[in-house]
């Protein structure tokens, strides 16, 4: 059978001979566009024996109905993908398994010369991938599949981490697809995007969370804007609610409390900074515990716990972090106790945040209020005024359910938030 499947009859034949497992990549109209702002161009499908191209909207082939293709893909028991969060914009997630969590593959490293030339010269075209020959898309994805096979990511001996593949991925997909409201005039004044259409639609700009970081802490940069480190001051006034008001919840003394939970320590008053001054706390948890402060009970217990954790790390195959995930030794350069503690803090921070966000997303189902931005110790909500009284107390309660107190700030834009 030819590798381009462009009729319903050909797809039916492929369906009759399908296996339980497959590998799929939805190729968008433009790789540089945010997935919320583009549509499928082609689908690369590999059944374990041969790779195929299923055309959706390409200049060289007849179009297969996208709903029929979706039905075909979802009929498989296991669909392996690179980047499940991206594929959730096009496919249901129940049978998607993200092999990037086993071994990350940079798709751009396999771009053909044609891909490179078109993306350099025609990056602004919304449907640039429909101009690149199908044979070149096929060549690229055949190479990616071959390399992934060599890395054994499809092997039954390697399982995708359940927490990362389910809760973690779904939470950040749900957040990301909301976008965040902007005043376009102010935004253009303070931020320089690579190409506006890649991430902006009307009064909304789309963020993009990168989930493939060593400690699982996601970064968030897209189209030339780093949303995880937005400059303070007037630049933040560029972000405005699409509903009525911005409400931010941020955790108080988050990292000291996370550490206390990890080592089973309880602060006497409940506030870490009543026991240890804030400056001393931060110097010692991030820079190593100094001898002159080691007498603090919190630091004494942390030192003992960290000694044992470091011993386990050296004896085992790697560092076990939150979510039953492991960072292998070969991925940790020049390991030491401070680095191990930092990695653990970041992983547990992300883990507890995901659990809280999952609960809040359930609360917001069917509501106008949306979560529009996540940073490591805070979330920003675009709140509808009709939902303020009922929703906000419940959201605060869910955020604090794991024992981490929050502060609430309110403002008409992101630069005008005032603590309440």
Could you describe each region identified by the protein language model?
Residues 1-114:
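Conserved RNase H-like, two-metal-ion catalytic cores of nucleic-acid enzymes
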Residues 31-40, 44-49, 55-62, 184-276, ...:
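Acidic, glycine-rich two-metal-ion catalytic cores of nucleic acid-processing enzymes
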Residues 81, 97, 240-255, 279-298:
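Conserved catalytic palm subdomain of right-hand nucleotidyl-transferase polymerases, strongest
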Residues 89-192, 265-267:
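Mixed-charge, glycine-rich, non-catalytic linkers/tails in nucleic-acid processing enzymes
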Residues 107, 177, 260-265, 283-287, ...:
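Short, well-ordered loop/turn and helix-capping segments at boundaries between secondary-structure elements
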């Amino acid at each position: 059978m030819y590798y381009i499947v462009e009729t319903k009859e050909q797809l039916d034949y492929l369906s009759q001979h399908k296996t339980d497992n497959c590998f799929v990549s939805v190729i968008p109209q433009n790789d540089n566009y945010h997935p919320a702002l583009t549509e499928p161009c082609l689908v690369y499908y590999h059944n374990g024996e041969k790779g195929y191209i299923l055309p959706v909207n390409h200049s060289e082939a007849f179009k297969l109905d996208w709903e029929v293709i979706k039905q075909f893909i979802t009929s498989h028991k296991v669909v392996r993908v690179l980047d499940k969060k991206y594929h959730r914009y096009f496919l249901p997630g129940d049978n998607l398994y993200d092999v990037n969590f086993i071994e990350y593959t940079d798709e751009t490293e396999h771009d053909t010369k044609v891909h490179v030339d078109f993306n350099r010269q025609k990056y602004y075209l919304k449907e640039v991938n429909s101009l690149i020959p199908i044979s070149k898309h096929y060549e690229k994805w055949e190479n990616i599949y071959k390399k992934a096979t060599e890395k054994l990511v499809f092997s039954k001996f390697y399982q995708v981490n359940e927490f990362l593949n389910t809760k973690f991925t779904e939470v950040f997909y749900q957040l990301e697809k909301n976008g965040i409201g902007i005043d376009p005039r102010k935004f253009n004044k303070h931020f320089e995007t690579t190409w506006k259409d890649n991430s902006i639609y009307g009064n909304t700009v789309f963020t993009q969370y990168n989930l493939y970081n060593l400690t699982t802490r996601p970064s968030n940069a897209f189209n030339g804007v780093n949303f995880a480190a937005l400059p303070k001051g007037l630049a933040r006034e560029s972000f405005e609610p699409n509903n009525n008001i911005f409400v931010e919840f941020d955790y108080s003394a988050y990292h000291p409390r996370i550490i206390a939970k990890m080592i089973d320590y309880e602060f006497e008053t409940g506030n870490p900074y009543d026991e240890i001054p804030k400056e001393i706390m931060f110097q010692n948890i991030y820079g190593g515990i100094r001898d002159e402060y080691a007498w603090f009970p919190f630091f004494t217990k942390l030192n003992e716990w960290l000694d044992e954790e470091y011993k386990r790390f050296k004896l085992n195959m790697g560092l076990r972090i939150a979510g039953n995930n492991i960072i292998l030794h070969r991925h940790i350069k020049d390991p030491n106790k401070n680095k191990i503690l930092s990695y653990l803090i970041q992983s547990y921070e992300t883990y507890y945040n995901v659990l809280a966000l999952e609960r809040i997303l359930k609360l917001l189902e069917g509501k106008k209020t949306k979560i529009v931005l996540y940073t490591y110790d805070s979330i920003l909500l675009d709140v509808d005024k009709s939902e303020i009284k009922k929703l906000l107390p419940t959201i605060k309660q869910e955020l604090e359910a794991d024992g981490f107190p929050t502060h609430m700030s309110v403002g008409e834009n992101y630069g005008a938030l005032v603590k309440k």
